[in-house]
Amino acid sequence: MNPYVEIIRPGNVIMAIIAVILVAILAKSVDIPIILAMLAVFFAMSAGNVINDYFDYKIDLINKPQRPIPSGRISLDNAKNYAYLLFILAAIVGFLISCLVDTWIPCTIVIFSDIILYLYAYKLKSTPLIGNLTVGFMTGLCFIFAGYTFNEGLIIYESYLLAFFALIMTTAREITKDIEDMEGDMAEGAKTFPILYGPKISAIIAISLIIIDCALCPLLYIYHIFNINYLIVVSIAVLIFLYGAVLLRNQDSKTANKVSKYLKTGMLIAFIAFAIGTFTITF
């Protein structure tokens, strides 16, 4: 894979774009502003991933030596300039969206996101729990951003509900990833939550968040946000989440890596459930 494509972490970026697509499905509408919203999310999230690798290159020499910067396929200067370009492109697209929908909220969200993504990579990531919550918050913000792109009350309300779900599960996954990366983080002197308070307490928090999200999933059906088809499909995601929670009783790096992948898979299935639950489909 081309290193400039690899460094943006296409899988993570696609997950963020899916958030925008899901809100479009909820609204049953696809127009120019929502297409631009996908583009803005692509640029902003890509920039965040690149600048994160820029600041993390020493840690990645231990944890992820195959990544573009530690492997020498992209220089530090090129990575930094690449990130800045992507941040600027995101802001430009955000400005265009605001002009089209006649509200400055989308542009404000994009600029705010650019700043938070940079601060996360520079400082917040190493702040215990705050860094994890920041990633969860940014994931949820993708839904809210899409909601304001439509600028309709009901869609905005529903986007906040989806954002809350994404915030909790993403935070759980980020804590799990910190458990996985403890060796490299300790070598670099990072003060992540698992390093300061231990992997066991960290796992308890992650498991608790997973259980909370699983308990909340039926509410989106009970309160008629989604139909019965959502409940059927999201049940699969819930089983995957709970299986990951059970595995996390063992906090070694290999298990944490496996759980992180399970949570990511479960979130993708949950997103599919959100989409299916919007339409009347007979299985």
Curated annotation (Swiss-Prot):
Keywords: Cell membrane, Lipid biosynthesis, Lipid metabolism, Magnesium, Membrane, Phospholipid biosynthesis, Phospholipid metabolism, Transferase, Transmembrane, Transmembrane helix. Pfam families: UbiA (PF01040). InterPro entries: DGGGP_synth (IPR023547), Prenyltransferase_related (IPR050475), UbiA_prenyltransferase (IPR000537), UbiA_sf (IPR044878). Its EC number is 2.5.1.42. Its main location: membrane. It is found in: Cell membrane. Gene3D superfamilies: UbiA prenyltransferase (1.20.120.1780). Its cofactor is Mg(2+). CDD domains: PT_UbiA_DGGGPS. The chain crosses the membrane at residues 5-27, 37-57, 85-105, 128-148, 152-172, 203-223, 228-248, 263-283. One of its GO terms (molecular function) is geranylgeranylglycerol-phosphate geranylgeranyltransferase activity. It is a multi-pass membrane protein. It catalyses: sn-3-O-(geranylgeranyl)glycerol 1-phosphate + (2E,6E,10E)-geranylgeranyl diphosphate = 2,3-bis-O-(geranylgeranyl)-sn-glycerol 1-phosphate + diphosphate. It comes from the Archaea. Signal peptide: none annotated. One of its GO terms (cellular component) is plasma membrane. Pathway: Membrane lipid metabolism; glycerophospholipid metabolism. The keyword Transmembrane applies. GO terms for biological process: glycerophospholipid biosynthetic process. Belongs to the UbiA prenyltransferase family. DGGGP synthase subfamily. NCBIfam families: PRK12884.1. Prenyltransferase that catalyzes the transfer of the geranylgeranyl moiety of geranylgeranyl diphosphate (GGPP) to the C2 hydroxyl of (S)-3-O-geranylgeranylglyceryl phosphate (GGGP). This reaction is the second ether-bond-formation step in the biosynthesis of archaeal membrane lipids. This is Digeranylgeranylglyceryl phosphate synthase.
